[in-house]
Amino acid sequence: MDTASTLTRATATLLAALAIQPGTTPPEPIEVAATKATQVVEIVVDAQAGWAIERFDLAGLEFPEVSVLFHETKDACQDNVGLYTGDTIHVCIRADGTYRDKVLLHELGHAWAARNLDDAQRQTFLELRGLGAWNDSGTDWGERGFEQAAEILAWGLLEIPTTPAQISTNDCESLTEAYEILVGAGVPRQQVCG
């Protein structure tokens, strides 16, 4: 059996551009026959979406209106574990648990920051963190304000304490101050720091 036949006979559970908004229920999965033009991609939507909405609600933050798609491979995330594209968040990690939760909150942090921080707030955050650029692709990932903001938001929202090890200056005082600059309120619970 050739690849085209295999793909034609295969089916994928697909929830296309599921918009997750507070108070909504995900629709039932749709069985779609795969064709030569499609890749078989399993998009897993589970209780994690509701959990993320709850994390934002508990912190008093408005959940960003974006589509959230869960994938089994990194293809949709450009070989990363997560990707924010403006109106869609892709989470490309198979494992359940704290790491996947953190990736989801990190990507949602990008969406929240893009919709809620003005230029003055971004500049204040950059100065506080000693960073030179908000989202310059020529700057190392951990030295971009956009990435640090997402990491710090995820750190503050995650219900299981973890340390944002991928960024510098991750002591409790610095992280707490940065979180407060971003959201205008304190961290919802005591967290682990560098």
Can you say where each PLM-predicted feature lies in the sequence?
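Auxiliary, metal-adjacent structural segments of Zn-dependent hydrolase domains
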Residues: T6, P27-D87
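Stable alpha-helical elements in mature extracytoplasmic
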Residues: Q48, A52, R100-L104, L108, ...
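Surface-exposed patches in mature extracellular/periplasmic domains of secreted proteins
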Residues: G60-F70, A120-L126, P161-N170
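Metalloprotease/metallohydrolase-associated module, dominated by Zn2+-dependent proteases
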Residues: L126-G194
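Sequence contexts marking disulfide-bonded cysteines in secreted/extracellular proteins
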Residues: A76-Q78, V91-I93, E173, V192-G194
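Short pre-active-site segment immediately N-terminal to the catalytic Zn-binding motif
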Residues: T88-L104
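C-terminal region of N-terminal signal peptides and the immediate post-cleavage residues
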Residues: T3-A34
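Catalytic Zn2+-binding segment of zinc metalloproteases
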Residues: L108-T124
